[in-house]
């Protein structure tokens, strides 16, 4: 099992995997949901630029997208924001991930977060924080298994840091 960074050459298999993830799910946004394949190809180019901190719209930060691949099969998506903003501190942190519906409940969420944490450290991201909707017990468990420490909460979210 491995993480593969998004490439402008990614094709149909990645597109189909992303179609197995809802548009918004547990606060994870899948912008590819509802896109045509041609739109997906254009989105890849934009995301590749963002990973290089180029052409980022105001109010956004650079992010790098990775695919979780198991035996050449795309399983899930992970996003690493290069830095935290006030908005992302409250609403998402700097790592987000989702597993395609047909692969859930098999430990892939735990694995993708483990690999994303290593990648974030390799990228020299100093502060790693995740937020979780309070009803999303599966993601809470994944974060705790990977060493996340609860440091705050409110009526809607749990806030975790990795030290």
Regions found by a protein language model. Name each.
Residues 2, 96, 129-131:
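Short aromatic/hydrophobic contact patches that present stacked aromatics
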Residues 20, 81, 106-123, 155-156, ...:
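Extended, folded domain segments that form the structural surfaces/walls around functional sites
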Residues 130-138:
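Conserved beta-strand-loop-alpha-helix junction that forms the acyl-donor binding cleft
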Residues 96-99, 105-118, 140-145:
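Conserved acetyl-CoA-binding loop-helix of GNAT-fold acetyltransferases
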């Amino acid at each position: 099992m491995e993480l593969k960074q998004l490439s402008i050459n990614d094709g149909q298999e990645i597109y189909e995997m992303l179609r197995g993830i809802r548009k918004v799910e547990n606060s994870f946004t899948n912008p590819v949901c509802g896109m045509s394949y041609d739109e997906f190809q254009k989105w890849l180019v934009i995301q590749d630029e963002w990973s290089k901190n180029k052409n980022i719209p105001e109010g956004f930060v650079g992010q790098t997208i990775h695919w979780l691949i198991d035996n050449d099969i795309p399983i899930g998506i992970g996003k690493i924001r290069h830095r935290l903003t006030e908005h992302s501190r409250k609403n998402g942190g700097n790592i987000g991930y989702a597993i395609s519906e047909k692969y859930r409940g098999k430990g892939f969420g735990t694995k993708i977060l483990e690999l994303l944490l290593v990648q974030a450290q390799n990228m020299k991201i100093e502060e790693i924080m995740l937020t979780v909707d309070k009803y999303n017990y599966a993601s809470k468990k994944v974060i705790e298994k990977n060493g996340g420490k609860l440091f705050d909460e409110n009526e809607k979210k749990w806030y975790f840091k990795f030290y």
